[in-house]
C-alpha cells in the first residue's frame, strides 16, 4: 500500500523518525516494552534503501525518487526552488547518485553515533557518491568531511502554495448534490 501511495502521489515524501538510542538504552525495556525508548537511526540509509527497493525494482522512476526525497518536501516546507531543485539561484545542496554502486550496510561503517543498524547486512544497489552542501563537497567516495556549525538557518515563508493546491483538490473532490 505504501508503494502504491508513492507511485500515485498520495504520499508525497519519505522520511525517518531518526532518533538513535544505543542497544543498552533499548535493553531498558527488555522486561517492560513501555520502557523501550522510541526511535532508531534511519536517515543515513533512507535514500539507499528507497532506491534499492523502489527504483531498482521498477516500483518508482528516477524522477519519482527525486520528488519523494527532495522536491516535494521543499515545496511542502515552502523553500522551493531554493531547495529541492538544481537551478540558477538555488542553494548548491546536491547529492550525486551512482545508480550502479553497491554497498552492504553495517553499524561498523555508518556515520551515526549508535552501535547497531536496523538495515545491518542489507546490500543495496544505488548510493550517493558525492554530497555538496552550500557548494562545498562534504562527502566523497565514503569519506565525510563536514565542519561543525557550518549549517545555517533557512527562512520558511508561511502559506506555501502547495497547501492551497491541496485545498482546491479537496474542494473538487467533495460530493456534489444532485437535485431531483
Feature map (PLM): residue ranges:
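His/Asp/Glu-enriched, well-ordered alpha-helical/loop segment
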Residues: 7-14, 19-101
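Intein/HINT protein-splicing elements and their conserved insertion hotspots or analogous self-processing inserts
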Residues: 141-180
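Phosphate/diphosphate-binding loops
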Residues: 1-2
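C-terminal cap of metal-dependent C-N hydrolases
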Residues: 28-32, 88-153
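Short, positively charged
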Residues: 63-64, 105-112, 165-167
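Short, surface-exposed, polar/charged, turn-prone segments marking secondary-structure boundaries
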Residues: 41-44, 122-127, 158-161, 165-168
Amino acid at each position: 500500500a505504501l508503494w502504491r501511495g508513492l507511485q500515485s502521489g498520495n504520499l508525497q515524501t519519505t522520511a525517518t523518525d531518526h532518533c538513535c538510542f544505543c542497544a543498552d538504552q533499548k535493553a531498558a525495556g527488555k522486561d517492560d516494552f513501555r520502557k523501550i525508548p522510541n526511535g532508531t537511526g534511519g536517515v543515513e540509509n533512507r535514500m539507499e534503501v528507497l532506491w534499492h527497493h523502489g527504483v531498482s525494482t521498477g516500483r518508482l522512476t528516477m524522477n519519482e525518487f527525486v520528488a519523494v526525497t527532495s522536491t516535494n518536501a521543499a515545496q511542502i516546507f515552502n523553500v522551493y526552488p531554493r531547495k529541492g531543485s538544481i537551478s540558477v539561484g538555488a542553494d548548491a545542496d546536491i547529492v550525486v547518485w551512482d545508480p550502479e554502486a553497491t554497498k552492504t550496510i553495517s553499524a561498523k561503517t555508518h556515520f551515526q553515533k549508535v552501535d547497531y543498524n536496523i538495515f545491518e547486512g542489507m546490500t543495496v544497489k544505488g548510493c550517493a557518491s558525492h554530497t555538496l552542501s552550500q557548494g562545498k563537497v562534504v562527502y566523497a567516495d565514503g569519506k565525510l568531511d563536514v565542519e561543525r556549525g557550518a549549517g545555517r538557518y533557512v527562512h520558511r515563508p508561511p502559506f506555501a502554495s502547495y497547501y492551497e493546491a491541496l485545498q482546491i483538490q479537496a474542494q473538487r473532490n467533495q460530493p456534489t448534490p444532485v437535485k431531483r
